[in-house]
Amino acid sequence: NVYYAADKSPLKEAIIALNGSSKGLVNNVCVPSDVSPLYAPEGKSLISVSLLGLHRDEHIPTEVKKELAAWFGEQVDGWQHLRTDIIKHALPEQAPKENPQNNTKEGKGFLKIDDIMICGDHTTSASIEGAIISGNQTAAALLKSMGK
């Protein structure tokens, strides 16, 4: 992930913007400070950019900004690079037949072993969306089991 501070969010709402072209470095962009300003330096927006593959090149922050200029225009010129985190094995390999959601009777999004509910993207699909779905489904099942 590559992180930038910006004067304002490039997004009009709190969403994850996906690269649908299957080209380039960028997989998705989100602005965590659109959800909570506490995530960003004071008075700034925090831009989080997820890349495909491992990139150790010191020029990656500049290359990412060049690519995102096609998405957001000249505003990226004012973005300040904060840090780059290289996360090995960020997403698990997950072939469809190995997907745990196919083997659980409790429903999509979590596993139940004994009386323990297990959630996470590893129980749905290896993605941010998978993690959110899993958390929501697990919370709903837990509330139902409590009679709420």
Language-model-detected regions and their locations in the chain:
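Mid-domain catalytic core of redox enzymes
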Residues: 1-60, 66-71
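Flexible, glycine-rich phosphate/dinucleotide-binding loops
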Residues: 38, 91, 125
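Short FAD-binding loop at a beta-strand-to-alpha-helix junction that anchors the flavin cofactor
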Residues: 48, 107-127, 131-136
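Active-site proximal loops enriched in glycine and acidic residues that flank catalytic Cys/His/Asp
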Residues: 51-53, 86, 120
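Conserved strand-to-helix beginnings and helix N-cap segments that scaffold or border functional pockets
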Residues: 58-62, 129-132
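Flavin (FAD/FMN) cofactor-binding core of flavoprotein oxidoreductases
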Residues: 60-111
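Internal hydrophobic alpha-helix adjacent to the cofactor/substrate pocket in enzyme cavities
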Residues: 131-148
